């Protein structure tokens, strides 16, 4: 595991701005309103030659444990315990506040290695705050400006000995580990081209849904620990939080997204940023888990979210949460399946699983459904099998003959995976009705065991494959005309 640095401090001192600078991307929401970041967010940081993991945390606040701020504080304390070092930020322009003093005392008593950073230190207005920071007893403060990139060399110098010491310890542990030989069969055939998730490219799963459907609670259950802030308040999650996890040796990166509401209801500037962040997470994901509330399933916004995931070409799993609160489970399940088939025909056959994020029931079913959806999304069908299948489908139900012209479906191949995409070479592709395309897509789903995954089917004329079609025949230049054809004898 890489060296981990947690950025902590009270709200609005510039933690997310510094996080974005270290990661090199705009991953965290940034606003001048305190308390924008509410969860733990991880990123791969680059600072000069240094490479490490950085955690952006919720703002430290003095608050009762039952309040939202109290839960944010507990989550931050957890990040400090997980990290190899933490960078405690204060606002140099404001100076040291009583809240800074309280949390500096907490950090001094912790076992963590603490660096002190005085952010927003650009300009003369920050000089007094920089001097005040010495009184916190955390060593010499680093004068930083996350917004303008100032002080990064000093931060590099402070982190370098910590990371070097960490890597020496890691290398010593690796050298002591036993070696394992893996025998490879040179005659083994590669039957599929399915990409197996790796640490560098893990399986990417996004959990989406309306506000307060239980997305963060669900992810905490899958992780086996409280990494995301949860509570009864709707809209607690404001960023698309990305977390790494391991499913029985399979590397997975899971995205918790802000709840998506109708555009008319998304008025606050921060919520608009959060929802667009969630939409971006859907585009990055391979499998999208659409989380419904069992009490009010398949609301209009649920249908929009599921349709968006399908149009983006993602594998989709429907998960119905709060199942522990249902009394007539059999009757409710039958009702859900009927509504699913009626309201989301474009996702016909996609997995529908019932879960309880609160109690942890159904987590194994959900995980199996995600892995199955991913496998189908990556599936490739041999060309010979496709063309035998196409012949049988045409024989059973020939395409129509508009205007007396018989349409011939000559050849079929799979052009892509993720999601599966097929091309049929035919005559008059523009004349093939949508109903016949649906007939073929439904047949592909059923006969090649591809339930629920988006399938793209394109009808193409054989002449479309000719790159020289509609190109004018080149005429000889005046010089060639004058010289005539070159003699073969030279």
From Swiss-Prot:
Q: Where does GTP 2 bind?
A: 209-216, 256-260, 321-324
Q: Which UniProt keywords apply?
A: GTP-binding, Nucleotide-binding, Repeat, Ribosome biogenesis
Its GO biological process terms?
Answer: ribosome biogenesis
Can the keyword Nucleotide-binding be found in this entry's annotation?
Answer: yes
Q: Which residues form the EngA-type G domain?
A: 3-167, 203-378
Keyword GTP-binding attributed: yes
- Molecular function per GO: GTP binding
**Entry's PROSITE patterns?**
G_ENGA
Q: Which residues form the KH-like domain?
A: 379-465
Q: Where is this region: Disordered?
A: 451-490
- Residue numbers binding GTP 1: 9-16, 56-60, 119-122
Organism's domain of life? Bacteria
Q: Which InterPro entries does the record cross-reference, listed alphabetically?
A: G_ENGA, GTP-bd, GTPase_Der, KH_dom-like, KH_dom-like_a/b, P-loop_NTPase, Small_GTP-bd
Question: Biased composition, Basic residues: where in the chain?
Answer: 469-484
Q: Which family does it belong to?
A: Belongs to the TRAFAC class TrmE-Era-EngA-EngB-Septin-like GTPase superfamily. EngA (Der) GTPase family.
Q: How does it assemble?
A: Associates with the 50S ribosomal subunit.
Summarize the protein's role.
Answer: GTPase that plays an essential role in the late steps of ribosome biogenesis.
| Name the UniProt record assigns to this protein | GTPase Der
């Amino acid at each position: 595991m890489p060296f981990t640095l947690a950025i902590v401090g009270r709200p609005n001192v510039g933690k997310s701005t510094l996080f974005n600078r270290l990661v090199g991307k705009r991953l965290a929401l940034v606003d001048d309103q305190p308390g924008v970041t509410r969860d733990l967010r991880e990123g791969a940081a680059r600072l000069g030659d240094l490479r490490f993991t950085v955690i952006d945390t919720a703002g430290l606040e003095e608050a009762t444990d039952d309040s939202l701020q109290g839960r944010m504080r507990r989550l931050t304390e957890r990040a400090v315990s997980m990290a190899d070092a933490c960078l405690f930020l204060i606002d140099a322009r404001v100076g040291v506040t009583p809240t800074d003093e309280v949390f500096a005392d907490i950090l001094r008593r912790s076992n963590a290695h603490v660096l002190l950073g005085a952010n927003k230190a650009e300009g003369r207005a920050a000089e007094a705050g920089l001097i005040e920071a010495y009184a916190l007893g955390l060593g010499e403060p680093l004068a930083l400006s996350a917004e303008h990139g100032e002080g990064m060399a000093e931060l590099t110098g402070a982190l370098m000995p910590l990371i070097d010491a960490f890597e020496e310890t890691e290398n010593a542990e690796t050298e002591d580990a036993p070696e394992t030989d893996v025998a490879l069969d040179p005659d083994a055939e590669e039957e599929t081209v399915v990409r197996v998730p790796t640490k560098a490219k893990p399986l990417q799963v996004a959990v989406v849904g309306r506000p307060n459907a239980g997305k963060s609670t669900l992810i905490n259950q899958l992780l086996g620990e409280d990494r995301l802030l949860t509570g009864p308040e709707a809209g607690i999650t404001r960023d698309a939080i990305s977390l790494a996890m391991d499913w029985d040796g399979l590397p997975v990166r899971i995205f918790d997204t802000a709840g998506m509401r109708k555009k008319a209801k998304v008025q606050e500037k921060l919520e608009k940023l959060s929802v667009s962040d969630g939409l971006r997470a859907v585009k990055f994901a391979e499998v999208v888990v659409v989380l419904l509330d069992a009490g009010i399933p398949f609301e209009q916004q649920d249908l929009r979210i599921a349709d968006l995931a399908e149009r983006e070409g993602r594998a989709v799993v429907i998960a119905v949460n709060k199942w522990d609160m249902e009394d007539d489970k059999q009757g409710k399940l039958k009702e859900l399946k009927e509504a699913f088939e009626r309201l989301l025909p474009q996702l016909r056959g996609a997995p529908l699983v019932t879960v309880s994020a609160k109690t942890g029931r159904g987590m194994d079913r959900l995980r199996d459904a995600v892995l199955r959806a991913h496998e189908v999304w990556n599936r490739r069908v041999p060309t010979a099998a496709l063309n035998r299948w196409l012949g049988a489908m045409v024989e059973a139900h020939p395409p129509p003959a508009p205007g007396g012209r018989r349409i011939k479906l000559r050849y079929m191949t799979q052009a892509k995976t993720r999601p599966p995409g097929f091309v049929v070479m035919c005559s008059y592709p523009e004349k093939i009705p949508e109903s016949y395309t649906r007939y073929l897509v439904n047949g592909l789903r059923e006969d090649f065991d591809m339930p629920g995954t988006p399938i793209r089917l394109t009808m193409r004329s054989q002449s479309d494959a000719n790159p020289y079609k509609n190109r004018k025949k080149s005429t000889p230049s005046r010089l060639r005309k004058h010289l005539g054809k070159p003699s073969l004898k030279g």
